[in-house]
Amino acid sequence: MSDRLRIGTWNVEYAAGAAKNARRIARMREGEAAIWVLTETHDELVLGDGYHVLPTEQRPHGRAGGRWVAIASRFPFTRAIPTHDPLRTVAGMIETPLGAVIVCGTVLPWHTDPGPSGDSRSWVEHHRVVPEQAAEWAALRAAHPGVHLCVAGDLNTDLGGAHYYGTKRGRAALVEGLRAADLVCLTSTDRVPAGWLGHPPIDHICATASLAARASVVEAWDGTAPDGLRLSDHSALAVELRGPR
């Protein structure tokens, strides 16, 4: 059995359009990612029969089948793990070549997210939700001490490089939350090879610190295809995690 595992994440901009979905799927299947954490997705975007899918609940607005997050895995889920916010987060345990891994997919609030009240000011929701989700990551680590944890999805903040999107407060809270849960961001700007993306990523893959030294970004592409077709307003990334030698 291989001691390598590739995990990717992509915000697919609500997975609208059959022709665009075909292009999105083809692009993702070009690589070797065994697990994809898709955000702003839809049930119509199906990677193939070889994938097991664990989605969030139906989005309360928009067309039927819309999901904030769906985890698609070539390896079966051994269990689903309840989350505090089943609309925007989903978690499941997967037996992988590196052993058991809990994958937690999420969409953190963006700058104009109106929040439950419908009138939250810019970045207020992001600042409120990051500590809540960080506490959940730490709780998952405490409840499953022998299991690797991967948190991935649309974090709506760049990390580890020149400022692009986010706030100092939100970035600091996210960094501290990852640290407290023994997680390392594997897709910070400084970890993405120069020239691969037009802008620093705000979608990220984070994993247990013990895996970080043997992890690297292996794929990244912008949301607009080389022929000019817009497939998303977000870039996609994939990392490879390697087991001990």
Task: Kindly label every feature range from the protein language model.
Residues 61-73:
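Short, charged, surface-exposed secondary-structure boundary motifs
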Residues 57-64, 82-86:
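Short, ordered beta-strand-loop transition motifs
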Residues 38-44, 210-211:
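Short, polar loop motifs at secondary-structure junctions
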Residues 33-36:
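Proline-aspartate-enriched helix->loop->beta-strand connector
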Residues 1-9, 13-26, 73-245:
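Active-site regions of metal-assisted phosphoester/phosphodiester hydrolases
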Residues 46-47, 159:
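Extracytoplasmic/secreted cell-surface and envelope-processing proteins
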Residues 49-59:
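Active-site regions of enzymes building and remodeling cell-envelope glycoconjugates
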